[in-house]
Amino acid sequence: MNPADADEEQRVSSVPAHRCRPGRIPSRSAETETEESSAEVAADTIGGDDSELEEGPLPGGDKEASAGNTNVSSGVACVAGFTSGGGVVSWRPESPSPDGTPSVLSLTRDSGPAVPSRGGRVSSGLSTFNPAGATRMELDSVEEEDDFGASLCKVSPPIQATRMLMGKKCHCHGYWGKFRFCGVQEPARELPSDRNALWREMDTVSRHSAGLGSFRLFQLIMRHGPCLIRHSPRCDLLLGRFYFKANWARESRTPLCYASELCDESVRRFVLRHMEDLPKLAEETARFVELAGCWGLYAAILCLDKVCRQLHGQDESPGGVFLRIAVALTAAIENSRHSRIYRFHLDARFEGEVLESVLKRCRDGQLSLSTFTMSTVGFDRVPQYDFLISADPFSRDASWAAMCKWMSTLSCGVSVSVNVTRLNADVNSVIRCLGGYCDLIREKEVHRPVVRVFVDMWDVAAIRVINFILKESTSELTGVCYAFNVPSVLMKRYRAREQRYSLFGRPVSRRLSDLGQESAFEKEYSRCEQSCPKVVVNTDDFLKKMLLCALKGRASVVFVHHVVKYSIMADSVCLPPCLSPDMASCHFGECDMPVQRLTVNVARCVFARSDEQKLHLPDVVLGNTRRYFDLSVLRELVTEAVVWGNARLDALMSASEWWVESALEKLRPLHIGVAGLHTALMRLGFTYFASWDLIERIFEHMYFAAVRASVDLCKSGLPRCEWFERTIYQEGKFIFELYRLPRLSIASARWEALRADMLEFGLRNCQFLAVGPDDEVAHLWGVTPSVWASRGTVFEEETVWSLCPPNRECYFPTVVRRPLRVPVVNYAWLEQHQEEGKATQCLFQAAPAIQNDVEMAAVNLSVFVDQCVALVFYYDSGMTPDVLLARMLKWYHWRFKVGVYKYCAS
């Protein structure tokens, strides 16, 4: 190594974590907080009475750590004392540097016995990464940066390799960061005086986009694009094309770039094996994406700035992205032990046909991975999953090993779900630590992970979490979302107008968490009220405070007993500590669970009327327009999604540790979601109110196709999942039989034949549908998210671009920056409009106006969803807590598992 390079590397690596430069926002001095007992907190905030607390120490009582609180909004995480088997993790201030740099907070660990993980060693993540042989990118100019993960990189080396791959070098200055350009200007509020001159200038610059021309085109689009779209929504497509042209000079259009050492070994071997055929396929894909793709400005930003990566200084082309995804999925299918069976169910004879089939589904947007997985699949030493559900009982101590595992997962861009009320640590300290570190990650990465904090509402620690949300709004953590596990006993007492509700310490609350059956939980709860220490609160006030936190702190409501009662598990199971961060996937095991999302685009099943003979088939639903919905195409897409999901599970288990394989083999969950439901209804000319039967029929066919494909895999010779005997499928039941018997559109003979095959051969998978938000995937393909209705004909969404980006002279933390908001056009509404003044009447309903219709449709479709349905609730500024409580009681009676995913102002 060059001595100069060695000195530079040593200089950069010596930068301490969370370093503050002169001129930056200084951190607050630590302030000692007054200790409050659980009874005082209950009486002050919730409305409880000190006399209601029985004598004796509260199990699981929390104390404020004396380490102090730092300003989380300035980007510094707060840790307040985590016990780790005799060792204590604490923050200590370092002495100021001679140049006057403010003191920094460094993470130290007192001496104490180490706490090994389950494998006898500290595990940094789910996938088995190989840090040895990790390539180092040589930068033209090494810039001094804040290595906020320096202390964590020593424990988890794969983080540094992941950050090298995730980063980009900007085209304008050559700075290493997360964006392709620097200096996003404030968008213009008014239209330019001469719009034709502006369009001519964009066209001229796009023809000479090499060098600084691309930066000039980028500035013109960001400056005038939002205002132009608001004035004329149809120009959104043209601006999207110009946005792609700004990147043409730096794009790599050869598929041989995926033979790089940055890519996975299976992808490299596949590319080298088919190096003669891939260039032609890449050229056809690029031409299709350019001509047939519906890329608006917001979709183009998602594609180029969140999905595309940079390989050796060159950006991926949009066509190359879909080719990489198809190659990675094909390699996962071919490298599986069951590749022959997978090819049979995909109706392909060799891997070339598999590649063509997968590529067609990907580029058309019929089947889609999440935007995070689309950006990482095919690369080496990066996670191949979307979320992590942390349910490992060995993490209850919140030790250094557990914190490193969660932080390393966040550093890779993966969102995490954690139940803080079941940890042997101060809940507020865990939230501050994980939330502060997550905010630091969100400053550096394009994919912004979140920490979903779950709270058991029968634990006394829930009071501390509610106080934390209500009182510390000034230092709100942008990367933290909350979820409240509401038991049935709380809803029943509110319905019966009982004023007393009890909260227990951790030993008692954990014992209650082991009782998944509603009757057993209520019986043990009544017994504990008579014999155990407790905190008594007012039921109405407690629920109102919880809903106020939901409106203020981006929290969701989970009816945890409904999750167990209407699940596939036949045996008695524990109450799940947490769902997935998107509130769609359930997990019933006592181990960490990675979640892989796969979305079916329902809007791609709508076709124009061209074949008159096909219109009379039983699987065809005619619309009020000249379009029809083909249910047979939907079943075909779901069948291929099941094959893709099983191949991805095989690839994930082969690259992970033994305990990950053991967790996935129990139920082999697929987590299949939907997108574009409201877009399909608008194109058919239907309203949500008139489409309840159609929506129920769509999800019936999806569930039937998923179960049939899983049975056929076992029928072909694959083994059934391990927990098949513990599910309702062992008894010959389907998920909709746990509810009322719906009106089935599929013939009963087909259901009975499926039941007989299921009892004879078993199921390869036991969890299929999980209707999550998947909003970025929907916006990428120009459709509505999930089963939600469209918010409007033209509405705004936040982008990854910031109006106050960091530079060498000034630094703004995440909470100070203002993200660039770009209008998003509803193309289903735009399709039926002509020129200005000649617009036809299009059937369109905004989401706040048809919220009740969407909820009723969710009630009908939830009988076929074996996991959860995440909904959006639109509220008015004048809505009182009593109205929210009434709606919450309605969601409970409708047997929703998740009361609401998020709250939005109408």
UniProtKB/Swiss-Prot annotation:
Residues 1-70, 89-129 are annotated as: Disordered. Residues 98-109 have a biased composition (Polar residues). It is found in: Virion; Host cytoplasm. Pfam families: Ribonuc_red_lgC (PF02867). The keyword Cytoplasm does not apply. One of its GO terms (biological process) is deoxyribonucleotide biosynthetic process. One of its GO terms (molecular function) is ATP binding. Gene3D superfamilies: 3.20.70.20. Keywords: Host cytoplasm, Late protein, Virion. It comes from the Viruses. InterPro entries: HSV_RIR1_betahv, NrdE_NrdA_C, RNR_lg_C, Rrm1. GO terms for cellular component: host cell cytoplasm; virion component. Does not possess a ribonucleotide reductase activity. Betaherpesviruses probably use another strategy to expand the dNTP pool in a quiescent host cell. Belongs to the ribonucleoside diphosphate reductase large chain family. This is Ribonucleoside-diphosphate reductase large subunit-like protein.
